[in-house]
Amino acid sequence: MNREEVYLSLGSNLGNRESNLAQATIALSINFEITDIISSSYYVSEPLYNKDQPEFLNSVVKFCTTLKPFEVLDVTQKVEKMLGRSNKLVKNQPRIIDIDILFFGNSVIETEKLSIPHPMIALRKFVLLPLAEIEPDFNVPHSKITIDDLIYNCPDKSRVVRHFMDVQA
């Protein structure tokens, strides 16, 4: 079976955001068909669309899998549900966890249920910065566009900064 590299965006702005992202990453890694999981640092970002909500904590996760794209979508939706995300969320509202598939190998998929590459990547600095951290030489599949190109041309001028966790000795 072919193993594909997959990139996910994780975001949370309700509850213990650090714990939500960590639990989502752990839940993904428990799936025996997901291996070699790597997570970026966490990044704090202000909400882009609905400004009347808490700041987000975001990360990007990379892994290898033999699962197919719609199977990965199913896994991500199960993780979201396990962590308490409601299926009835209104777009751009606060959420415990949000997991989006950014890239799936060189796949290009456009259906009502799934779009790969994610259509909003180039517009979201909170996705681009953590992606560049774990994959600085990344090129968008089927193009010569680099992660640096995407960051340079990103229209998102919102504040996105690396998050440093408070660790008690």
Give the role of each language-model region.
Residues L48-E55, L67-D74, K78-A169:
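Flexible, gly/pro- and Lys/Arg-enriched active-site loops
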Residues M1-E4, V167-A169:
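Short, Lys/Arg-enriched, disordered terminal segments
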Residues N2-L10, L14-K91, R95, N106:
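Nucleotide and nucleotide-moiety/phosphate-recognizing core
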